[in-house]
From Swiss-Prot:
This is Large ribosomal subunit protein uL30. NCBIfam families: PRK06049.1 (NF004711), uL30_arch (TIGR01309). Keywords: Ribonucleoprotein, Ribosomal protein. The keyword Ribonucleoprotein applies.
Length: 153
């Protein structure tokens, strides 16, 4: 499962890239979405790679994001009780592990918003004009996306 975080704004962005961002529901900076690893999303991520950070998320980071930034309709927080009542899982951690392993999806939680509005990273970005290979934040982080998401929790 990919975690995709928008790092750059929408000024002077080509229409096709902005359209792909809309399809991914990345309308604003510091918004994060989770998408499955399949050829359709891989192509979309490849198209917007110069404006986002992405990588494979692990279960602990997903659980942390669900606890801190998970919101339901009406802007209420996602709680352990809500997960227990509305899914087959006992905790947010167990649900996050199931999502990462592909046993369930985020859509199985009713009224869960698909976009996580993150905080800007604590201690700042490494740079939003350069790729990870050049010492910045843009592009494919691989497993390193978990460190960025922890900074943005």
């Amino acid at each position: 499962m990919y975690a995709i975080v928008r790092l750059r704004g929408q000024v002077n962005v080509r229409y096709t890239i902005e359209d792909t961002m809309k399809m991914l529901r990345l309308h604003k900076v510091n918004h994060c979405v989770l998408v499955p690893e399949n050829p359709h999303f891989k192509g979309m991520v490849q198209k917007v790679k110069d404006y986002v950070a992405f990588g494979k998320i692990d279960a602990n980071t997903l659980a942390e994001i669900l606890e801190n930034r998970g919101r339901l309709e009406g802007d209420t927080r996602l709680t352990e009780e809500y997960i227990r009542e509305n899914t087959a899982y006992d905790s947010i951690q167990a649900f996050a592990e199931a999502v990462v392993n592909g046993e369930t999806t985020l859509k199985s939680v009713p009224k869960l918003k698909p976009v996580f509005r993150l905080h800007p990273p604590r201690k700042g970005h490494a740079g939003i004009k350069r790729t990870v290979q050049q010492g910045g934040e843009l592009g494919d982080h691989g497993d390193g996306i978990n460190a960025l998401l922890h900074k943005m929790r």
